[in-house]
């Protein structure tokens, strides 16, 4: 700082000191010589910045007016200053080399923001950019931005015609300020979009129909299961009723005598149980000989009616035969045989008096079952 301050003060003084001249001139000459050598060897290939002394006017001795006035006896200072002061014009503008040239990819990346900022109105400029990019080869085209009016007209035309003929395509391109290629590409893309939309709708409809079919199948299966269950219940109920009815008929048939004379079956109408039938049922559980007794009584009764005997026709009042009860019949049957057979083919011999007695007594019991 003191050195520079003294030099600035020396600008006012007309006579500089000897030490100041000795310290300032030799390095300046060396720098000028080195700069001239470098410029000659490189042959203006690169731009070399000026020396540090030239950037600061206070440190440049050639531009200082006091050097010309004070140090006039030294001729070396002026030629050195004259050699270093002029700068050639070629050094300021270096030549371009292949590695210094900008690539087209960098230009393409820089162009889309500018194109987007201009808006969709500059269609002619965009077309020129697309042509320039297409000539480069291997690079991707810029996407065309259509205006609302262009899209509206294109959609209208697509609604009526999915495919365009050449004259119509040229007409639409001229009407909408587009190229024929742009119109063709837009229609291709629109057809693909329409195809995707229709396929999605068909898939959704098929899925909905399939779901409806599955639901209807499930409902039908449930209804079939319910109907089968109801049928099984009704069949089981009918079987139970039938079994109960057959059981009741079997019980009643066991109480009656179904066998007739000479193997002919004789059926009796079903009537409600009377007091005598109840007594017979009671004795049926007590002794196994009651059905045999009843069968013999039915056979004797049938024989008496078929022979038209006066004993069978002349029926006395039932009050006269109250003496003969079922107990007496059972006692008589037990007295005659411990195991009385139920058929006429029995090998046991019974006397005629006993048959007459049975016919007289049993006809009165069987007459109670007849409906007059």
Curated annotation (Swiss-Prot):
Record's GO cellular component terms: nucleoplasm; nucleus
Keywords, sorted A to Z: Developmental protein, DNA-binding, Homeobox, Nucleus, Transcription, Transcription regulation
Keyword Signal found: no
Localization (cell): Nucleus
Chain residues forming the annotated DNA-binding region: 139-198
SUPFAM superfamilies, per the entry: Homeodomain-like
GO terms of biological process kind: anterior/posterior pattern specification; brain segmentation; cell fate commitment; cell fate determination; cellular response to retinoic acid; dorsal/ventral pattern formation; embryonic skeletal system development; embryonic skeletal system morphogenesis
UniProt-recorded Gene Ontology molecular function terms: DNA-binding transcription repressor activity, RNA polymerase II-specific; RNA polymerase II cis-regulatory region sequence-specific DNA binding; sequence-specific DNA binding
Function, as annotated: Sequence-specific transcription factor which is part of a developmental regulatory system that provides cells with specific positional identities on the anterior-posterior axis.
Family classification: Belongs to the Antp homeobox family. Proboscipedia subfamily.
Annotated protein name in UniProt: Homeobox protein Hox-A2
Top-level taxonomy: Eukaryota, Metazoa, Chordata, Craniata, Vertebrata
